Amino acid sequence: MNVSRKELRVLNVLAQGGRILKHKDENGRLTHVACVTPEGWQLSLCTLEVFQQLKRRKLISSVKGGPYLITRLGLQALCGSSKTR
């Protein structure tokens, strides 16, 4: 699976225990996402576009409206990309 460098960095943070938090406006539309590392730092590479690509490929998912976490498919994509480098 082809995964861009930005997506790999976001997946790497999620694999280490990070989370993606979503922010919505008063109409319920997604306006901003924030990728937070386990230490509490915010990753600037995680844009709305990168988030949508990861979600579309089912590399991340949310359970019961919680923060987005990496899925098994995301872990496989992360491990598979490290073998090719």
Swiss-Prot record:
The residue stretches assigned to a coiled coil in this entry are: none
Its domain of life reads Bacteria
> Which NCBIfam families does the UniProt entry name for this protein?
PRK13687.1
Natural source organism: Myxococcus xanthus (strain DK1622)
Query: To which protein family does this belong?
Result: Belongs to the UPF0386 family.
* A Pfam family that the UniProt record links to this protein: YjhX_toxin
- Name by which UniProt lists this protein: UPF0386 protein MXAN_1729
